[in-house]
Amino acid sequence: MSNEVETSTTNGQPDQQAAPKAPSKKEKKKGSEKTDEYLLARFKGDGVKYKAKLIGIDDVPDARGDKMSQDSMMKLKGMAAAGRSQGQHKQRIWVNISLSGIKIIDEKTGVIEHEHPVNKISFIARDVTDNRAFGYVCGGEGQHQFFAIKTGQQAEPLVVDLKDLFQVIYNVKKKEEEKKKVEEANKAEENGSEALMTLDDQANKLKLGVDQMDLFGDMSTPPDLNNPTESRDILLVDLNSEIDTNQNSLRENPFLTNGVTSCSLPRPKPQASFLPESAFSANLNFFPTPNPDPFRDDPFAQPDQSAPSSFHSLTSADQKKANPGSLSTPQSKGPLNGDTDYFGQQFDQISNRTGKQEAQGGPWPYPSSQTQQAVRTQNGVSEKEQNGFHIKSSPNPFVGSPPKGLSVPNGVKQDLESSVQSSAHDSIAIIPPPQSTKPGRGRRTAKSSANDLLASDIFASEPPGQMSPTGQPAVPQANFMDLFKTSAPAPMGSGPLVGLGTVPVTPPQAGPWTPVVFTPSTTVVPGAIISGQPSGFGQPLVFGTTPAVQVWNQPSSFATAASPPPPAVWCPTTSVAPNTWSSTSPLGNPFQSSNIFPPSTISTQSFPQPMMSSVLVTPPQPPPRNGPLKDTLSDAFTGLDPLGDKEVKEVKEMFKDFQLRQPPLVPSRKGETPSSGTSSAFSSYFNNKVGIPQEHVDHDDFDANQLLNKINEPPKPAPRQGVLSGTKSADNSLENPFSKGFSSTNPSVVSQPASSDAHRSPFGNPFA
């Protein structure tokens, strides 16, 4: 295609050009050169055009140079490849070669982008690797530029034409100079000075010829820069091999392992110091000192004889004096898995200074190293090492723990008492007595957290005298909880739950019949809320938390916990689920307390006898059965404080005057049934239907104000007790509150009239 372009772009006389082309090919075969006439005719006018693409333009420092041109070509090809990845394309151009020089013309617009005369072109470089690329350097002094061009066809014809162009120009000038020389020779006799000028001109011509020989050069660049980093990778590999050689020579010299050129940690195998692990360890030694044992890197040496790790190089002199045994002992038998694992242990130690203080604040002080290493180990690794504490004493029996009061790098104060009492504490920790169960460990954990929170010294070891023989912490250990205590501690209190004072939270008991019951419900109205019962037991669960005791502000709910459970006949047919509030939602009538729980489910140990008698004397009819709840509540406080009815609801007060007139008339009617009189039935019905709903709803809602008022105020009587029936007289409130729970065997509520007479207290009613 270039040949077609050449013939079409030459100025006229194609017949004349065709004639010399044939002999030129023959002459090329013969090795003869092209004639000047042919070259002049070829580059005359517009010259020759070649279709190409402009790779790029780069500024270069020198006018010529193969290496410079190669570097510039590589740079421009890389930039072109980057632009191609972004969708950019090279500029399509025409390269015009003529006697005037080189012209770069835009293919689309035909505008001459660049024009360089022959005398401005200082160097032309061809690419021996990429046969479709070449470049040339042009510009004045200090303004040299390298133009990289990629031709559509082979670049060799274009470079040959450039050579021919320079050659023909040189020949033309030479001929002109010869003509001038002949003319000057004819005139030389006239002026001898002209002979000197002729010599100077000849010297310049020779110099021009020499420059023409240095005009062209060769460069080598890859044809395609799809992988431009190939040569760089080779250089990096060579450099890496050189580094390996240097490091091997350093590694073989044992006297250079002083903490600067190699890691100061004992290693199972030699490693190059430029690795990340050893480089990090070398950075730890900010003040390296010569190693007294240059052969300690021997992988076959015993780990006990290894030098101190680099972690101790960070330790100050005071800390080293404080713990003299830590530097002379092996650091957890050396790094078992190499430097990486040992660095992981060091980082664990740093993190455990703040993250794992629970073990430090525990009830056990730090024991001696022998028992600790011999017993408290897991998988051959000591417990302190697993927790990140590498400050272990030597297993040598002659090496003791550090002196008392001296600080350790972790800030732990190891008292002399801990080393003396170490064997006892270890025996307790490993073989705890039977009393030390999971609750005991829970208390120990609470104690340790307490020390972490409020102790002056988090890491201070606990004196042995404060430890109980059973392995549980003594009572004075929880003294910080006394800040919140407002009442005496419970006799069977456990932990900070009892020390909370007036907060009526029932601690869990180990007995099988006392589940946890939330007592604020009982403090509101002791008789209204019934403790939950498990289905497997026949006795009521109120024995664990007696509401009557809580009402009188006793700090512990275990005052009557030792009382024996009632017979199994007292087990109601309708049992409430454990730890549940009394709810009326699943019942048909929300005001029937008998549907919530039968009177037999109420603990007779928790309430006085008047309350229990009033519960048992309720009539069998469903409407009157609503009364036992309110009567139980009112009778309990009426017998204790007759004047305590100041805060009774208005609904109660509506019928208070009518109900208070009948109790004095009832004492002689103990044998009568409550259903015999219409007035008592009316009174009980009216009392249960009108007086209870408001109070019962209040108990279901658990008003916070009512809870606080009921806890702090004295007991109040409920004067409505006599309206139920003639048998429910005022003396019912004075019966023995404990006689019913121990002696009654009434299995049902139907026979309540007879059972109430049989179990009445022989004592009279002093308030009747």
Curated annotation (Swiss-Prot):
Residues 619-627 are annotated as: Required for interaction with CSK. GO terms for biological process: cell morphogenesis; cellular response to epidermal growth factor stimulus; cellular response to transforming growth factor beta stimulus; clathrin coat assembly; extrinsic apoptotic signaling pathway; hematopoietic stem cell proliferation; in utero embryonic development; leading edge cell differentiation. It is found in: Cytoplasm; Cytoplasmic vesicle, Clathrin-coated vesicle membrane; Membrane, Clathrin-coated pit. CDD domains: PTB_Dab. Residues 45-196 form the PID domain. Residues 230-447 are annotated as: Required for localization to clathrin-coated pits. The modification N-acetylserine is found at S2. Residues 1-36, 285-449, 660-682, 709-768 are annotated as: Disordered. GO terms for molecular function: AP-2 adaptor complex binding; cargo receptor activity; clathrin adaptor activity; clathrin binding; integrin binding; low-density lipoprotein particle receptor binding; phosphatidylinositol binding; phosphatidylinositol-4,5-bisphosphate binding. Residues 649-768 are annotated as: Required for interaction with MYO6. Residues 601-731 are annotated as: Sufficient for interaction with GRB2. It holds the Pfam family DAB2_SBM. The modification Phosphothreonine is found at T673. Adapter protein that functions as a clathrin-associated sorting protein (CLASP) required for clathrin-mediated endocytosis of selected cargo proteins. Can bind and assemble clathrin, and binds simultaneously to phosphatidylinositol 4,5-bisphosphate (PtdIns(4,5)P2) and cargos containing non-phosphorylated NPXY internalization motifs, such as the LDL receptor, to recruit them to clathrin-coated pits. Can function in clathrin-mediated endocytosis independently of the AP-2 complex. This is Disabled homolog 2. It comes from Rattus norvegicus. The gene is Dab2.
